[in-house]
Amino acid sequence: LGPGATNLTTPAAYAALGAFPLVIITGQKPIKTSKQAQFQIVDVVSLFTPLCKASTQIVNGNRIPSLVREGFRLAQEERPGAVLLELPEDIAEEQTVEPVIPPHDRRYAVAGDAALDEAARRILAAQRPLLLIGAGANRRRASKALRKFVSDTGFPFFDTQMGKGVVDEDSELYLG
């Protein structure tokens, strides 16, 4: 509640900088009626707005399933990052008639054969090709293919902070 949520600013910033999906669900004092006035109430939604892809207070119990699902979707989609959902005590206690939303399949855009062939043609025609390896390269299927690509082509490469370790940095092709 309130002040305790401030301890999550560092993980939220880290998720934003590192493109890591993170869903933060914080509590809050009741918003409809409160006997404690504003004691220990911090505007968590505003605090997290610059750090998160979305920062929302849930104000209706029927919206909990859809907002949680949307929070997870938004946190994972390109570019991943943090999403904050603030759930006040009185809203959390509301009865809801909304059904639980089943998980959905995640689909990534994949370039067609013609686009891949054209990209390969341009890369192979380059006079001094250089690879920049970033965060997207650390996906399971991409990293293995990228290591093979570097090995097969002999192209020099460097990486961003989030691309480190995808291809062996001890390689003579690594530029730092």
Task: For the regions a language model picked out, list residue spans one by one.
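N-terminal alpha/beta PP-like core and its mobile active-site loop of ThDP/TPP-dependent enzymes
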Residues: 1-176
